[in-house]
UniProtKB/Swiss-Prot annotation:
Protein family membership: Belongs to the peptidase C56 family.
Active site residues according to the UniProt entry: C104 (nucleophile), H105
Any one biological process term the GO annotation gives: proteolysis
Induction trigger: By heat shock, salt stress, oxidative stress, glucose limitation and oxygen limitation.
Keywords: Hydrolase, Protease, Stress response
All residue ranges annotated as the PfpI endopeptidase domain in the record: 3-171
UniProt keyword Thylakoid, yes or no: no
GO MF terms held by the record: peptidase activity
Entry superkingdom: Bacteria
Organism name: Bacillus subtilis (strain 168)
Identification of the protein by name: General stress protein 18
């Protein structure tokens, strides 16, 4: 049976870091719900190749409605972490030990959620010091799986490994 995956997303996400995992999750039978501030609006990726219609407002969802969380990178996570509703939503997944998949700049939301302390993780080069300052054991690998809950990757080049490990975790 497919899992329900929340996707937190806003303008200027990294196109392929949403489209490729979304495609892989859907092909595996999972259901995605794109969450932003406003339901029904269209958000565009920073490369201009992806446009996504928002399925739900952050005000209308609860982490208990979902089995996992996807945080694509780009500029989206930095914008979302300025809104405490998204920070608390993200934190709830970590607290409840539900799978969280964060690629590139995605861990920025985890930093603000104070959810990286003691975790092994990776992310885009420019946020690794921030991740370390948040208590993460940061490694430079294409994909890191921590405590059968958190999957992180560095860049779009890592998407195949990111998808593989994320899908494997959803099967557990």
């Amino acid at each position: 049976m497919g899992k329900k995956i929340a996707v937190v997303l806003t303008y200027y996400f990294e196109d392929s870091e949403y489209t490729e995992p979304a495609k892989a999750f859907k092909e595996a039978g999972h259901e995605l719900t794109v969450i932003e501030k406003e339901k029904g609006k269209t958000v565009k990726g920073k490369q201009g190749t992806a446009e996504v219609t928002v399925d739900a407002s952050i005000d209308d969802v609860n982490s208990s409605d979902f089995d996992a969380l996807l945080i694509p990178g780009g500029f989206s996570p930095d914008q979302l972490r300025a809104d405490d509703r998204f920070v608390q939503f993200t934190k709830a997944f970590m607290t409840d030990k539900k799978p969280v998949f964060a690629i590139c700049h995605g861990p920025q939301l985890l930093i603000n959620a104070k959810a990286l302390d003691g975790r092994k993780a990776t992310g885009y080069t420019s946020i690794r010091v921030d991740m370390e300052n948040a208590g993460a054991d940061v490694v430079d690998k294409e994909v890191v799986v921590c405590q059968d809950q958190l999957v992180t990757s560095r860049t779009p080049d890592d998407i195949p490994a990111f998808n593989r490990e994320s899908l494997a975790l959803l099967e557990k």
